[in-house]
Amino acid sequence: MEETVAFYQTVLGFTPTTQSAEYSIVERDGQTVHFMKAASEEVMKCVRGHTEIYIEVRDIHSLWEHVKSFRDRYKIRDLFDREYGMTEFHIGDPNECLIFVGEPTSR
């Protein structure tokens, strides 16, 4: 849990609001992400690498300038524009969750 919270705080700029070994919450721009410890290692093995989340942010370009410095530690897809009107980058977290980070292109 500590590694996950540290990733969201250090890399993506979230602020921890609740933190324990079993359950933690981080917040950024009024959005929260909740983390719960897996029921067992077997459950974790089943979901590892099969989870995706989408986080909408403000000022993606300044966040991207920070995040791209972690290329040597995490799998990252560079900032790009999507056909559905979002500017995004993608990053894998320490638990192999794929995180889509985006902002409406028109902002």
Tell where the protein language model's regions lie, with residue ranges.
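Flexible, glycine-rich phosphate/dinucleotide-binding loops
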Residues: E42, G85, R107
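Amphipathic alpha-helical segments
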Residues: E2-T15
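N-terminal beta-strand motif that seeds the catalytic metal site of vicinal oxygen chelate
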Residues: M1-V5, T51-I53, E103-R107
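Conserved short beta-strand elements that form part of the metal-binding/catalytic scaffold
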Residues: T15-R48, L98-E103
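Short secondary-structure junctions
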Residues: G13-T18, Y74-I76
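Vicinal oxygen chelate
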Residues: M1, I53-L98
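Alpha-helical segments within the soluble intracellular
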Residues: Q9-T10, E27, K68
